[in-house]
């Protein structure tokens, strides 16, 4: 059985309190490519003490990889994280319907994370403490990006490999789609996986192997697979199957059950989201 944790905010160490004034959070938008969807917005709390560096949380929004949804879903999370003393990078990327899909969506996520290397000096970012919080399809992309080291070599995804890229130190997946084979079998969101990858697994087996976080196990970084108990959009199996498979070597993932539904996970006022925030803070150390 998967390693299940029942957590509530009361059982986790508190993060720093929010800034006394919301406008003290600095917002800076940067492009990492020429496409209108290739950008991120950096949310910064008060500067660290002189000579000190701070980690950063990459926020990756969901929407079943479709262009109908964008980074506006991640913005409230990025604001909240910054108000609680954490730098946050709200990442936009090309999706199916606006130039994304295979391989553009995956290229953008890696390039967007790598943009932090360019920004690190200016904003005192610690590239050894870059973690991700991803919701739904964004959870898939976050956990997939954590396994980028598996892309090197002659296997699937070698064209996406970059040995010099920024590596994630951990992930909080919020009801993430972490098993693409099962998601395809269940035909989640009317064929969202096939829409992302340009066809079925029988047509493009190599793409599916590259894109599936299951194929990158074992990972050498921690993953908290947070799942809402009343989630009707992404089945619990998406998290549970991944966590169960993670136990064979590497760093075991943890299944964290929280109250609420799919969208409570991205509501900064909900207890479900509060658990996600605390786990992100835990990963940053």
Name the predicted role of every residue range.
Residues 225-227, 231:
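Short beta-strand/loop motif that positions the catalytic acidic residue
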Residues 68-78, 89-129:
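Catalytic nucleophile-loop/oxyanion-hole region of alpha/beta-hydrolase
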Residues 114-186:
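Primarily recognizes the serine-hydrolase "nucleophile elbow" in alpha/beta-hydrolase
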Residues 46-53, 57-80:
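Short, surface-exposed "cap/lid" segments of acyl-processing enzymes
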Residues 261-271:
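Catalytic histidine-centered segment of alpha/beta-hydrolase-like enzymes
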Residues 4-51:
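N-terminal cap/lid segment of alpha/beta-hydrolase-fold proteins
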Residues 232-241:
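Conserved alpha/beta-hydrolase "acid-adjacent" motif
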Residues 19, 35, 182-215:
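Mobile cap/lid helix-loop segments that gate and shape the active-site cleft of serine hydrolases
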């Amino acid at each position: 059985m998967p390693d299940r944790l029942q957590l509530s905010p009361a059982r986790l160490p508190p993060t720093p309190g929010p800034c006394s004034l919301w406008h003290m959070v600095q917002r800076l938008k940067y492009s990492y490519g020429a496409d209108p969807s290739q950008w991120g917005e950096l949310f910064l709390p008060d500067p660290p003490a002189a000579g000190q560096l701070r980690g950063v949380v990459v926020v990756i929004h969901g929407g079943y990889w479709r262009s109908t949804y964008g980074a506006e879903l991640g913005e409230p999370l990025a604001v909240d994280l910054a108000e609680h003393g954490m730098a946050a990078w709200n990442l936009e990327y090309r999706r199916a319907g606006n130039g994304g899909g295979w391989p553009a969506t995956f290229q953008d996520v890696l390039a967007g994370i790598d943009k932090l290397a360019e920004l690190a000096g200016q904003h005192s970012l610690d590239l050894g403490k870059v973690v991700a919080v991803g919701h739904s399809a964004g959870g898939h992309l976050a956990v997939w990006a954590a396994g980028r080291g598996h892309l090197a070599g002659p296997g699937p995804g070698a064209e996406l490999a970059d040995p010099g890229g920024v590596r994630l130190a951990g992930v909080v997946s919020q009801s993430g789609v972490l098993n693409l084979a099962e998601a395809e079998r269940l035909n989640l969101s009317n064929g969202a996986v096939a829409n992302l990858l340009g066809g079925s697994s029988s047509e493009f087996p190599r793409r599916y192997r590259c894109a599936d976080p299951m194929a990158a196990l074992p990972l050498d970084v921690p993953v908290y697979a947070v799942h809402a108990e009343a989630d009707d959009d992404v089945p619990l199996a998406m998290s549970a199957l991944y966590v169960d498979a993670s136990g064979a070597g590497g760093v075991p993932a943890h299944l964290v059950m929280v109250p609420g539904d799919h969208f409570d996970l991205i509501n900064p006022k909900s207890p479900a989201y509060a658990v996600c925030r605390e786990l992100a803070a835990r990963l940053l150390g």
